[in-house]
Amino acid sequence: SLLERIGGEGSSADEAEEMENISVKRVQPDETEEWESFLQQSPLTLYLEMSSENYHRADLLGVALSDGEQHLFLDWETAAGWEAFAQWLQDPEREKWCYDIKGNQVALRRQGLSSDGYSFDVMLASYLINASDSAHQLSDIAQRRQIGGLPEDEAVYGKGAKRRQLTGQELAEHLARKVHTIHQLKPILEKELQENHLDALFFELELPITHVLARMELAGVQVDRERLQQLGEELREH
């Protein structure tokens, strides 16, 4: 079971049980109009699931959206055909919390969709706060904050040649757990950024740079990651 894959005790185990029984609405193509009012909320949490970690080549499998209470899932075909979703994505006034802005922007642009309005990225925040850690998967970030209930992708999909693709309800629930976790992490990470005096660096430098890097990658500009990391270290020291 999911609980066995996660383990944990106390409140973490309670959260794991809540996550195992997570409620998610699978929006069908003929139901999208009913959910347009949901997109009027701001902020919303967004998660895009891809077929691999290489967002330059990966297929988009599905989308999860959450307001913290309700979790929606759409397979990619349904999401791609939903005009109101495309408008919401590109609206800078509609706040979006996510995991990996750059990956989202590149993957969506490859599908002909622009996206804007990202106000928080839990992966980027984790890189700043836990710079010495190499593990920044969403499940790693949650585990470090004692947020239970999200299994590692490898535990869900399998590894290498044994990797399988999820579909239907199984995929919907996995993405609902991810989007719910992002929603939980956002205020925690924002507080950690403030406590570590990294909030100005995050909001005034790192977030804007992420948008620039996405555009550069889409344009095919080679990015010297090591040099950028070095610059980041120098900026943190000042």
Regions from the PLM with identified roles:
Residues S1-W88:
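Long, highly charged low-complexity segments
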Residues G8-E15, D133-I141, E233-H238:
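Compositionally biased, low-complexity linear motifs
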Residues E20-V24, A64-E195, F202-L213:
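Active-site-proximal helix-loop-helix substrate-binding element of RNase H-like nuclease domains
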Residues L46-E49, S66-G68, Y99-D100, A219, ...:
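Generic beta-strand/beta-sheet core signal
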Residues L201-H238:
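Extended, well-ordered alpha-helical scaffold/bundle regions in very large, multi-domain proteins
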